[in-house]
Amino acid sequence: MIIAEDEEAICVADDPAIVEIDAISKLSFDADRQHAYKRIAAREGLSEAAQVHLVKEALDNLSFEAAKEDILLTLIRNPGFSSAAESAMLKRLDKFSFESSKNKILEVINQRRTQAPTAVK
C-alpha cells in the first residue's frame, strides 16, 4: 500500500523505518528528534525509500542547523548511503541557512565519492 508519492520517492506503509521516522517527527523536542533521527541514519540496511524519507523529515522537522547537518552527515557516512538519498539532500540544500553547512554536506559527499571503490571492468 502506497502512503505517499512524490517525484523523489514512493514510501511504502510496510517499511517499519518509515513508520518510525514519522513517529519521531511528532516528538515535541528538537533534541529528542535529533537523537532518534541520528540512530536511524546510522542504521545498517536502511532502505533507499527510508533514507530519502529521513532526509525530508529531518530537514523539515529540525529547527537547528547543526542538528540537520548532524543527521545528514551521519547518513552520508553510513556504508549503505544511497544515490537517491544523495539526490534528496542535494535538492534540499536550500533548507540550510548557512553556506558553511551547505559546503560541509557537499564536501563530505564529494569525499565519499572519491573514496568509493571503482568498478572492475
Descriptions of predicted regions:
Residues 1-121:
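Non-catalytic all-alpha helical scaffold/repeat segments
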